[in-house]
């Protein structure tokens, strides 16, 4: 009997082990044949996959492993051959982007084929007004990227940026700006970190030029070590990513240490790089002075139509320009400075296009054809004899145009020549530089857009862990998307990591910062949120230690903080509460019903006022009508305001003195005990 039980247990263990193994047996001939054909085509259909999969029940983890394995082989799983699109890159993302981390490993799927079919099933095409569903549907239409796809897009981003930088380096405006920035650095009005990208410059050429990638085993080991470290931290703190108050994924004390280290490292890098950068800027300034002389000479010759530079001068011009481009590229300028240079270039180009557009429209108004105008104008922007040459043209409209609009044409061309003088190069050269910068910027922007759209699933998988913390799900997604875009800008594919590994931190940081900054009805600065988190965590720890809530004095002693600061933080940490909050089990009353209204009249005071009004009316009615009216007008009883003797006298067509006498007589009557007794009780109360 014992032997039988032992055999059953062994069989059960064997089944469990089999269920955790891979779905595809790579030693099977049918599987080998299917994979070989799929690699050749780049995809495999669901029917072909189901034919080689086992029919027994499998776990969701096995399904995910199989999909990841096929993706790593470069095989895309599709519904059928008609659904295959040309050029689709069927990669898989990491665990964050691919599936729900909360799913249980032991949960059983109906079968391997059915589960895979369900995993690839598309969203229904029925209409919906739910913005979340609409967003998810649009997001799902974008294919995931393989590692090779990510690297290809990252290279396109880098190439576009290099093209843009190369264009900027050919513009004299860039060198003028660099000389100004050098002077600001010398004067101490600008920090080095505001001009160059410290981290990129500090890492040196080896970080950029290293073509080799880290081994997958090393990357996987680093990832597992980071996960173990995170689990240990959570177990030690007894909390999830964020405290109850809402804040960062790291404990505040660790964040403060990280920030201090970051600040120190930035200062250290700045101090170390400053001599090298200043030397480069000095070289740029000296070289540009030599180049500027040749540029001015070239522009003057074009304006005077006296020829061009000699061949020796042209060679020298090219050598100086190459030296400047090499020096500028070695600086790794800050992105904000690059944007400022591009904006300056585009602003001048906008003014140029406006002037050229005015000239073209003016010519077309005299019947000059557009193609004819462009043929005569392009390349002769700075030719001083252009007016004379177009006046001799026999084509329709040219003579009338040159004769009638002589003054206007000269004014417009003078503005164009001023732009050439401002840029230091010819108009055709300036236009070529602008097109080069625009091309690089456009290519980089398109590639960044593709990278962002392909990783929107990663934002969803991270954002869903931060729901019910004060922000709507769509707001969390959009904040995460902002972090994703920052990650795309800063991603360095040469380090060998997948983009999702790098982007996760940026996305989580953007989401947690937004929760800390926006989740509360009354905004609290992020640095104060971190202090609140620290106090809440310490308070929870002390509650376990001493068995009661700690006092502010105990918290101040434990945290080594001033008592007043602890009290202030505890006061700030209180959450607003709605006046409509139900009170009691029956929920027929609300919190607002129990709050005193300081401006409202008390019921007893209202009763006294009503009784006084009624008694005063009865007492005044015992006087003559004339006396009653005089008293009412003089003291404003039952009226909006009181009246002077003069105003009352005008009403009765008598003198002020007569009104005073009537008033005095009426007051004497009121002092009689029969009347005053009725009013005295109000005076006493």
From Swiss-Prot:
Segments of this protein annotated with the region Sigma-70 factor domain-3: 530-606
InterPro entries with a match to the protein in the record: RNA_pol_sigma-70_dom, RNA_pol_sigma70, RNA_pol_sigma70_r1_2, RNA_pol_sigma70_r2, RNA_pol_sigma70_r3, RNA_pol_sigma70_r4, RNA_pol_sigma_70_non-ess, RNA_pol_sigma_70_r1_1
Annotated segments matching region Disordered: 1-26, 83-132, 206-263
Keywords, alphabetical: Cytoplasm, DNA-binding, Sigma factor, Transcription, Transcription regulation
UniProt xrefs under Gene3D superfamilies: RNA Polymerase Primary Sigma Factor, Sigma-70 factor, region 1.1, Winged helix-like DNA-binding domain superfamily/Winged helix DNA-binding domain
Induction statement: Expressed during exponential and stationary phase growth, under autologous control.
Biased segments, Basic and acidic residues type: 1-18, 120-132, 217-239
Residue segments, region Sigma-70 factor domain-2: 451-521
Transcription regulation as UniProt keyword: yes
SUPFAM superfamilies noted in UniProt: Sigma2 domain of RNA polymerase sigma factors (SSF88946), Sigma3 and sigma4 domains of RNA polymerase sigma factors (SSF88659)
Segments of this protein annotated with the region Sigma-70 factor domain-4: 619-672
One annotated GO biological process: DNA-templated transcription initiation
GO CC list: cytoplasm
Ranges of biased composition (kind: Acidic residues): 92-105, 251-262
Subcellular compartments: Cytoplasm
DNA-binding region: 645-664
Molecular function (Gene Ontology), one example: DNA binding
Motif (Interaction with polymerase core subunit RpoC) on chain: 475-478
HAMAP family: Sigma70_RpoD_SigA (MF_00963)
Family: Belongs to the sigma-70 factor family. RpoD/SigA subfamily.
Function: Sigma factors are initiation factors that promote the attachment of RNA polymerase to specific initiation sites and are then released. This sigma factor is the primary sigma factor during exponential growth. The sigma-70 promoter consensus for this organism is 5'-CTTGAC-N(16-23)-TATNNT-3'.
Subunit structure: Interacts transiently with the RNA polymerase catalytic core.
Name this protein carries in UniProt: RNA polymerase sigma factor RpoD
């Amino acid at each position: 009997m014992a032997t039988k039980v032992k055999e059953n247990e062994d069989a059960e263990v064997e089944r469990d082990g089999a269920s955790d193994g891979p779905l595809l047996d790579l030693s099977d001939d049918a599987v080998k044949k299917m994979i070989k054909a799929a690699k050749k085509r780049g995809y495999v259909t669901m029917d072909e996959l189901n034919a080689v999969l086992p029919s027994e029940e499998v776990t969701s983890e096995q399904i995910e492993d199989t999909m990841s394995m096929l993706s790593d082989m470069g095989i895309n799983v599709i519904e059928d051959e008609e659904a295959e699109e040309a050029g689709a890159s069927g990669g898989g993302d990491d665990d964050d982007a691919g599936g729900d981390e909360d799913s249980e490993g032991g949960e059983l799927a109906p079968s391997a084929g059915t589960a895979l079919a369900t995993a690839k099933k598309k969203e229904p095409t029925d209409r919906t007004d739910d913005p979340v569903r609409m967003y998810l549907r649009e997001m799902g239409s974008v294919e995931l990227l393989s590692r090779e796809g990510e690297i290809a897009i990252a290279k396109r981003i880098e190439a576009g940026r290099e093209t843009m930088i190369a264009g900027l380096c050919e513009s004299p405006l860039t060198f003028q700006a660099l000389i100004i920035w050098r002077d600001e650095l010398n004067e101490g009005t600008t920090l080095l970190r505001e001009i160059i990208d410290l981290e990129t410059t500090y890492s040196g050429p080896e970080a950029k030029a290293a073509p080799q990638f880290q081994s997958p085993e090393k990357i996987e080991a680093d990832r597992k070590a980071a996960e173990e470290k995170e689990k240990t931290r959570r177990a030690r703190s007894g909390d999830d990513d964020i405290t109850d108050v809402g804040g960062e994924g790291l404990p505040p004390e660790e964040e403060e240490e990280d920030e201090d280290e970051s600040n120190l490292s930035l200062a250290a890098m700045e101090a170390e790089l400053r001599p090298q950068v200043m030397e480069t800027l000095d070289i740029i300034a000296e070289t540009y002075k030599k180049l500027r002389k040749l540029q001015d000479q070239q522009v003057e010759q074009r304006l005077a139509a006296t020829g061009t530079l000699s061949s020796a001068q042209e060679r020298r011009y090219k050598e100086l320009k190459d030296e400047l481009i090499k020096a500028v590229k070695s600086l790794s300028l800050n992105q904000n400075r690059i944007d400022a240079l591009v904006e300056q270039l585009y602003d001048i180009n906008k003014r140029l296009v406006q002037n050229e557009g005015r000239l073209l429209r003016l010519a077309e108004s005299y019947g000059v054809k557009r193609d004819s105008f462009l043929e005569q104008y392009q390349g002769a922007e700075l030719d001083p004899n252009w007016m004379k040459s177009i006046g001799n043209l026999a084509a329709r409209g040219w003579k009338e145009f040159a004769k009638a609009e002589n003054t206007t044409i000269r004014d417009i061309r003078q503005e164009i020549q001023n732009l050439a003088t401002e840029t230091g190069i010819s108009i055709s050269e300036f236009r070529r530089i602008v097109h080069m910068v625009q091309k690089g910027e456009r290519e980089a922007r398109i590639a960044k857009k593709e990278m962002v759209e392909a990783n929107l699933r990663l934002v969803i998988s991270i954002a869903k862990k931060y729901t019910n913390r004060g922000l709507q799900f769509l707001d969390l997604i959009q904040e995460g998307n902002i972090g994703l875009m920052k990650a795309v800008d800063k991603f360095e594919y040469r380090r060998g990591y997948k983009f999702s590994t790098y982007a996760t931190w940026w996305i989580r940081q953007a989401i947690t910062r937004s929760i800390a900054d926006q989740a509360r009805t009354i905004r609290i600065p992020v640095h104060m949120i971190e202090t609140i988190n620290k106090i809440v965590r310490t308070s929870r720890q002390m509650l376990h230690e001493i068995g009661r809530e700690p006092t502010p004095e105990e918290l101040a002693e434990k945290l080594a903080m001033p008592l007043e600061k602890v009290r202030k933080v505890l006061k700030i940490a209180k959450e607003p509460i709605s006046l409509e909050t139900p009170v009691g089990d029956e929920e027929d009353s609300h919190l607002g019903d129990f709050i005193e209204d300081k401006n409202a009249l008390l019921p007893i005071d209202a009763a006294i006022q009503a009784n006084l009004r009624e008694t005063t009316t009865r007492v005044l009615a015992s006087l003559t009508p004339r006396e009653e009216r005089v008293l009412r007008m003089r003291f404003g009883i039952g009226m909006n305001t009181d009246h002077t003797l003069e105003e009352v006298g005008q009403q009765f067509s008598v003198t002020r003195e007569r009104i005073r006498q009537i008033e005095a007589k009426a007051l004497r009557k009121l002092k009689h005990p029969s009347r005053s007794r009725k009013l005295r009780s109000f005076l006493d109360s």
